[in-house]
Regions:
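Phosphate-backbone recognition surface of nucleic-acid-processing proteins
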Residues: 207, 213, 219-299
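Short helix-capping/linker segments at secondary-structure and domain boundaries
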Residues: 113-118, 224-228, 276-283, 311-324
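Nucleic-acid-processing active sites and adjacent nucleic-acid-binding tracks
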Residues: 24-50, 55
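Stable alpha-helical structural segments in soluble proteins, enriched in small hydrophobic residues
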Residues: 99-110, 269, 273, 308, ...
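Short glycine-rich phosphate-binding loop at a beta-alpha junction
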Residues: 52-64
Length: 330
Protein backbone atom coordinates (compact mmCIF):
# COMPACT_ATOMS: atom_id res chain seq x y z
CA UNK A 1 0.00 0.00 0.00
CA UNK A 2 1.41 3.37 -1.04
CA UNK A 3 1.85 5.74 1.94
CA UNK A 4 -0.23 8.87 1.28
CA UNK A 5 0.57 11.78 3.56
CA UNK A 6 -2.28 14.00 2.41
CA UNK A 7 -5.89 13.25 1.42
CA UNK A 8 -7.61 16.04 -0.51
CA UNK A 9 -11.33 16.26 -1.15
CA UNK A 10 -12.35 17.88 -4.43
CA UNK A 11 -15.83 19.14 -5.28
CA UNK A 12 -16.05 19.62 -9.04
CA UNK A 13 -18.57 21.69 -10.96
CA UNK A 14 -18.75 22.71 -14.60
CA UNK A 15 -16.62 25.84 -14.20
CA UNK A 16 -14.90 25.59 -10.80
CA UNK A 17 -13.23 23.20 -8.37
CA UNK A 18 -13.14 23.43 -4.58
CA UNK A 19 -10.26 21.59 -2.93
CA UNK A 20 -9.93 20.91 0.79
CA UNK A 21 -7.39 19.35 3.14
CA UNK A 22 -9.71 18.60 6.05
CA UNK A 23 -6.98 17.58 8.48
CA UNK A 24 -5.35 21.01 8.28
CA UNK A 25 -8.58 22.92 7.50
CA UNK A 26 -7.06 24.35 4.30
CA UNK A 27 -9.11 25.04 1.20
CA UNK A 28 -8.81 26.43 -2.31
CA UNK A 29 -11.31 27.69 -4.89
CA UNK A 30 -10.11 27.65 -8.51
CA UNK A 31 -11.35 27.47 -12.08
CA UNK A 32 -11.85 24.07 -13.65
CA UNK A 33 -9.23 24.68 -16.34
CA UNK A 34 -5.48 24.78 -16.90
CA UNK A 35 -5.14 28.13 -15.14
CA UNK A 36 -6.99 26.80 -12.11
CA UNK A 37 -4.86 23.66 -12.01
CA UNK A 38 -1.74 25.83 -12.03
CA UNK A 39 -3.18 27.72 -9.07
CA UNK A 40 -3.73 24.37 -7.34
CA UNK A 41 -0.09 23.35 -7.85
CA UNK A 42 1.09 26.67 -6.40
CA UNK A 43 -1.27 26.23 -3.42
CA UNK A 44 0.21 22.78 -2.77
CA UNK A 45 3.74 24.17 -2.97
CA UNK A 46 2.89 27.00 -0.55
CA UNK A 47 1.55 24.48 1.99
CA UNK A 48 4.34 21.89 1.50
CA UNK A 49 1.98 19.31 -0.03
CA UNK A 50 3.93 16.64 -1.93
CA UNK A 51 1.63 15.65 -4.81
CA UNK A 52 3.50 12.36 -5.27
CA UNK A 53 2.28 11.37 -1.78
CA UNK A 54 -1.20 12.87 -2.11
CA UNK A 55 -4.48 11.01 -2.65
CA UNK A 56 -7.43 12.87 -4.15
CA UNK A 57 -11.06 11.89 -3.51
CA UNK A 58 -13.87 13.22 -5.67
CA UNK A 59 -17.41 12.39 -6.71
CA UNK A 60 -18.81 11.18 -10.00
CA UNK A 61 -20.33 14.24 -11.68
CA UNK A 62 -21.22 12.81 -15.07
CA UNK A 63 -18.25 14.35 -16.87
CA UNK A 64 -17.32 17.63 -15.21
CA UNK A 65 -14.49 15.87 -13.36
CA UNK A 66 -12.74 14.55 -16.48
CA UNK A 67 -10.62 17.63 -17.11
CA UNK A 68 -9.33 17.58 -13.53
CA UNK A 69 -8.71 13.81 -13.71
CA UNK A 70 -6.66 14.28 -16.88
CA UNK A 71 -4.57 16.84 -14.99
CA UNK A 72 -4.10 14.37 -12.11
CA UNK A 73 -2.93 11.67 -14.51
CA UNK A 74 -0.50 14.06 -16.22
CA UNK A 75 1.00 14.84 -12.79
CA UNK A 76 0.92 11.19 -11.61
CA UNK A 77 -1.44 12.04 -8.72
CA UNK A 78 -3.46 9.12 -7.31
CA UNK A 79 -7.23 9.65 -7.18
CA UNK A 80 -10.49 7.79 -6.76
CA UNK A 81 -14.09 8.69 -7.56
CA UNK A 82 -17.04 7.67 -5.40
CA UNK A 83 -20.82 7.95 -5.91
CA UNK A 84 -22.13 11.13 -4.30
CA UNK A 85 -24.79 9.13 -2.45
CA UNK A 86 -22.14 6.96 -0.78
CA UNK A 87 -20.33 10.03 0.55
CA UNK A 88 -23.58 11.74 1.54
CA UNK A 89 -24.75 8.75 3.58
CA UNK A 90 -21.43 8.66 5.46
CA UNK A 91 -21.80 12.21 6.76
CA UNK A 92 -24.64 11.78 9.24
CA UNK A 93 -26.67 14.92 9.97
CA UNK A 94 -25.49 17.81 7.81
CA UNK A 95 -26.72 21.41 7.94
CA UNK A 96 -26.14 23.79 5.08
CA UNK A 97 -24.51 23.19 1.73
CA UNK A 98 -21.74 24.86 -0.24
CA UNK A 99 -18.99 23.71 -2.58
CA UNK A 100 -16.37 24.48 0.07
CA UNK A 101 -18.27 22.47 2.71
CA UNK A 102 -18.76 19.59 0.26
CA UNK A 103 -15.00 19.50 -0.46
CA UNK A 104 -14.33 19.39 3.30
CA UNK A 105 -16.71 16.46 3.77
CA UNK A 106 -15.25 14.59 0.80
CA UNK A 107 -11.77 15.03 2.28
CA UNK A 108 -13.01 13.74 5.65
CA UNK A 109 -14.54 10.74 3.90
CA UNK A 110 -11.18 9.95 2.29
CA UNK A 111 -9.20 10.44 5.51
CA UNK A 112 -11.45 8.01 7.36
CA UNK A 113 -10.88 5.33 4.69
CA UNK A 114 -7.36 6.10 3.53
CA UNK A 115 -5.96 2.71 4.60
CA UNK A 116 -8.52 0.91 2.40
CA UNK A 117 -8.37 3.17 -0.64
CA UNK A 118 -7.12 1.97 -4.00
CA UNK A 119 -6.42 4.43 -6.85
CA UNK A 120 -8.74 4.45 -9.85
CA UNK A 121 -7.55 3.07 -13.15
CA UNK A 122 -6.40 5.65 -15.74
CA UNK A 123 -9.12 7.13 -17.93
CA UNK A 124 -9.86 5.19 -21.10
CA UNK A 125 -10.10 7.53 -24.11
CA UNK A 126 -12.51 5.16 -25.86
CA UNK A 127 -14.81 5.25 -22.80
CA UNK A 128 -14.72 9.06 -22.80
CA UNK A 129 -15.67 9.14 -26.48
CA UNK A 130 -18.37 6.54 -25.86
CA UNK A 131 -19.95 8.70 -23.14
CA UNK A 132 -19.82 11.76 -25.38
CA UNK A 133 -21.47 9.89 -28.25
CA UNK A 134 -24.20 8.52 -25.97
CA UNK A 135 -24.93 12.01 -24.60
CA UNK A 136 -25.24 13.44 -28.12
CA UNK A 137 -27.36 10.50 -29.26
CA UNK A 138 -29.72 11.20 -26.35
CA UNK A 139 -30.02 14.82 -27.47
CA UNK A 140 -30.85 13.77 -31.03
CA UNK A 141 -33.48 11.32 -29.80
CA UNK A 142 -35.12 14.01 -27.65
CA UNK A 143 -35.09 16.49 -30.54
CA UNK A 144 -36.70 13.88 -32.79
CA UNK A 145 -39.45 13.27 -30.24
CA UNK A 146 -40.08 17.04 -30.07
CA UNK A 147 -40.43 17.33 -33.85
CA UNK A 148 -42.73 14.30 -33.92
CA UNK A 149 -44.98 15.95 -31.32
CA UNK A 150 -45.00 19.15 -33.38
CA UNK A 151 -46.18 17.24 -36.47
CA UNK A 152 -48.81 15.32 -34.50
CA UNK A 153 -50.23 18.42 -32.77
CA UNK A 154 -50.24 20.53 -35.94
CA UNK A 155 -52.08 17.88 -37.94
CA UNK A 156 -54.61 17.49 -35.13
CA UNK A 157 -55.21 21.21 -34.51
CA UNK A 158 -55.11 22.60 -38.04
CA UNK A 159 -55.97 19.56 -40.20
CA UNK A 160 -53.08 20.20 -42.57
CA UNK A 161 -51.19 17.70 -44.71
CA UNK A 162 -47.57 16.82 -45.30
CA UNK A 163 -47.19 19.76 -47.70
CA UNK A 164 -47.61 22.24 -44.82
CA UNK A 165 -44.34 24.20 -44.45
CA UNK A 166 -43.87 23.51 -40.73
CA UNK A 167 -44.67 19.81 -41.10
CA UNK A 168 -42.31 19.53 -44.07
CA UNK A 169 -39.48 21.24 -42.11
CA UNK A 170 -40.11 19.06 -39.05
CA UNK A 171 -40.10 15.96 -41.28
CA UNK A 172 -36.75 16.98 -42.75
CA UNK A 173 -35.36 17.47 -39.24
CA UNK A 174 -36.62 14.03 -38.20
CA UNK A 175 -35.02 12.39 -41.25
CA UNK A 176 -31.71 14.19 -40.60
CA UNK A 177 -31.74 13.19 -36.93
CA UNK A 178 -32.40 9.57 -37.90
CA UNK A 179 -29.38 9.65 -40.21
CA UNK A 180 -27.14 11.25 -37.56
CA UNK A 181 -28.35 8.80 -34.92
CA UNK A 182 -27.50 5.89 -37.19
CA UNK A 183 -24.00 7.31 -37.77
CA UNK A 184 -23.45 7.70 -34.03
CA UNK A 185 -24.66 4.18 -33.28
CA UNK A 186 -22.31 2.81 -35.95
CA UNK A 187 -19.41 4.70 -34.35
CA UNK A 188 -20.39 3.38 -30.89
CA UNK A 189 -20.25 -0.21 -32.11
CA UNK A 190 -16.97 0.51 -33.90
CA UNK A 191 -15.47 1.74 -30.62
CA UNK A 192 -16.73 -1.23 -28.64
CA UNK A 193 -15.53 -3.77 -31.22
CA UNK A 194 -12.09 -2.14 -31.32
CA UNK A 195 -11.48 -3.31 -27.74
CA UNK A 196 -11.64 -7.10 -27.42
CA UNK A 197 -12.49 -7.13 -23.71
CA UNK A 198 -15.07 -4.39 -24.07
CA UNK A 199 -16.76 -6.18 -26.95
CA UNK A 200 -16.81 -9.48 -25.08
CA UNK A 201 -18.39 -7.85 -22.00
CA UNK A 202 -20.94 -6.15 -24.26
CA UNK A 203 -21.87 -9.52 -25.77
CA UNK A 204 -22.13 -11.03 -22.27
CA UNK A 205 -24.52 -8.44 -20.86
CA UNK A 206 -26.69 -8.19 -23.98
CA UNK A 207 -27.21 -11.96 -23.81
CA UNK A 208 -29.43 -11.25 -20.78
CA UNK A 209 -33.12 -10.93 -21.63
CA UNK A 210 -34.10 -7.29 -21.24
CA UNK A 211 -30.62 -5.85 -21.80
CA UNK A 212 -30.59 -4.49 -25.34
CA UNK A 213 -27.97 -2.48 -27.25
CA UNK A 214 -28.70 0.88 -25.56
CA UNK A 215 -28.53 -0.55 -22.04
CA UNK A 216 -25.43 -2.46 -23.09
CA UNK A 217 -23.71 0.68 -24.39
CA UNK A 218 -24.61 2.73 -21.34
CA UNK A 219 -23.55 0.03 -18.88
CA UNK A 220 -20.18 -0.39 -20.59
CA UNK A 221 -19.70 3.39 -20.61
CA UNK A 222 -20.74 4.22 -17.06
CA UNK A 223 -19.06 1.25 -15.40
CA UNK A 224 -16.01 2.02 -17.60
CA UNK A 225 -16.14 -1.56 -18.81
CA UNK A 226 -16.82 -2.86 -15.29
CA UNK A 227 -13.68 -1.33 -13.76
CA UNK A 228 -14.98 1.74 -11.91
CA UNK A 229 -17.28 -0.04 -9.42
CA UNK A 230 -16.06 -2.81 -7.09
CA UNK A 231 -19.31 -4.76 -7.23
CA UNK A 232 -22.92 -4.73 -8.40
CA UNK A 233 -24.24 -3.14 -5.22
CA UNK A 234 -22.04 -0.05 -5.55
CA UNK A 235 -23.24 0.39 -9.14
CA UNK A 236 -26.85 -0.13 -8.06
CA UNK A 237 -26.44 2.67 -5.49
CA UNK A 238 -25.06 4.92 -8.25
CA UNK A 239 -28.00 4.10 -10.53
CA UNK A 240 -30.47 4.58 -7.68
CA UNK A 241 -32.17 1.20 -7.35
CA UNK A 242 -31.08 0.34 -3.80
CA UNK A 243 -33.75 1.27 -1.22
CA UNK A 244 -32.59 2.75 2.08
CA UNK A 245 -34.28 2.70 5.47
CA UNK A 246 -36.35 5.74 6.45
CA UNK A 247 -37.18 5.27 10.09
CA UNK A 248 -36.08 6.51 13.48
CA UNK A 249 -37.32 5.66 16.96
CA UNK A 250 -41.09 5.47 17.24
CA UNK A 251 -42.04 8.61 15.34
CA UNK A 252 -40.58 8.05 11.87
CA UNK A 253 -41.75 4.80 10.31
CA UNK A 254 -41.34 5.32 6.60
CA UNK A 255 -40.91 2.52 4.13
CA UNK A 256 -37.58 1.83 2.50
CA UNK A 257 -37.14 4.01 -0.54
CA UNK A 258 -34.61 4.77 -3.23
CA UNK A 259 -32.71 8.03 -3.16
CA UNK A 260 -33.32 10.93 -5.52
CA UNK A 261 -29.51 11.10 -5.88
CA UNK A 262 -29.12 8.76 -8.82
CA UNK A 263 -27.91 8.54 -12.40
CA UNK A 264 -31.39 9.08 -13.76
CA UNK A 265 -30.67 8.29 -17.43
CA UNK A 266 -29.30 4.87 -16.51
CA UNK A 267 -32.24 4.28 -14.19
CA UNK A 268 -34.71 5.27 -16.92
CA UNK A 269 -33.16 2.88 -19.45
CA UNK A 270 -33.15 0.08 -16.85
CA UNK A 271 -36.87 0.66 -16.33
CA UNK A 272 -37.49 -0.39 -19.92
CA UNK A 273 -35.09 -3.33 -19.55
CA UNK A 274 -36.94 -4.53 -16.45
CA UNK A 275 -40.32 -4.38 -18.23
CA UNK A 276 -38.97 -6.37 -21.17
CA UNK A 277 -37.38 -8.90 -18.81
CA UNK A 278 -40.70 -9.43 -17.02
CA UNK A 279 -42.40 -10.04 -20.40
CA UNK A 280 -39.81 -12.33 -21.97
CA UNK A 281 -37.83 -13.99 -19.16
CA UNK A 282 -39.73 -16.91 -17.58
CA UNK A 283 -37.78 -16.47 -14.33
CA UNK A 284 -38.48 -12.74 -14.04
CA UNK A 285 -42.11 -13.20 -15.08
CA UNK A 286 -42.64 -15.89 -12.43
CA UNK A 287 -40.99 -13.63 -9.82
CA UNK A 288 -43.24 -10.69 -10.77
CA UNK A 289 -46.41 -12.79 -10.75
CA UNK A 290 -45.54 -14.18 -7.33
CA UNK A 291 -44.76 -10.79 -5.80
CA UNK A 292 -47.72 -8.96 -7.38
CA UNK A 293 -50.02 -10.78 -4.97
CA UNK A 294 -48.92 -8.53 -2.12
CA UNK A 295 -46.39 -6.02 -3.51
CA UNK A 296 -46.65 -2.81 -5.52
CA UNK A 297 -45.64 -3.04 -9.21
CA UNK A 298 -43.11 -0.19 -8.89
CA UNK A 299 -41.32 -2.02 -6.08
CA UNK A 300 -41.23 -5.22 -8.15
CA UNK A 301 -39.89 -3.29 -11.16
CA UNK A 302 -37.15 -1.81 -8.98
CA UNK A 303 -36.24 -5.28 -7.67
CA UNK A 304 -36.02 -6.62 -11.22
CA UNK A 305 -33.65 -3.76 -12.12
CA UNK A 306 -31.41 -4.77 -9.22
CA UNK A 307 -31.55 -8.41 -10.33
CA UNK A 308 -30.47 -7.38 -13.84
CA UNK A 309 -27.51 -5.43 -12.41
CA UNK A 310 -26.49 -8.38 -10.24
CA UNK A 311 -26.75 -10.67 -13.25
CA UNK A 312 -24.62 -8.41 -15.45
CA UNK A 313 -21.81 -8.11 -12.91
CA UNK A 314 -21.91 -11.83 -12.09
CA UNK A 315 -21.69 -12.92 -15.73
CA UNK A 316 -18.92 -10.45 -16.56
CA UNK A 317 -16.94 -11.65 -13.54
CA UNK A 318 -17.30 -15.27 -14.69
CA UNK A 319 -16.79 -14.40 -18.36
CA UNK A 320 -19.91 -16.30 -19.41
CA UNK A 321 -22.96 -15.44 -21.53
CA UNK A 322 -26.40 -15.85 -20.03
CA UNK A 323 -28.12 -19.20 -20.54
CA UNK A 324 -31.84 -19.53 -19.78
CA UNK A 325 -32.26 -22.71 -17.74
CA UNK A 326 -35.23 -21.72 -15.56
CA UNK A 327 -37.83 -24.40 -15.02
CA UNK A 328 -41.05 -23.46 -13.29
CA UNK A 329 -42.16 -25.81 -10.53
CA UNK A 330 -45.30 -27.78 -11.32
Amino acid sequence: MKPWNVVLGVDVSKKTIDICWAEQKLSLHADNNSEGFGKFKKWCKDHSIDLSKTFIVLEYTGGYEYRFIQFCESQHIDYRRFPGLEIKNSRGMVRGKSDKADAFRISQYGEERVKRLEPSNPLNKDILELKTLLAFRKRLVRERAGYQNTVKERKHMYEVGDQDMIIAMAGAKIAANDEYTGDIEARIMELIKSDEKMYFNYQVITSIKGIGPINGWMTIAYTENFTSFPDARHYAVYVGVIPFDHRSGTSIKGRKRTSYLAQKELKQELNQAARIAILHSPEMRAYAERKLKNKDYKLILNNVKFKLILRMFSLVKRGEKYVENYRRAA
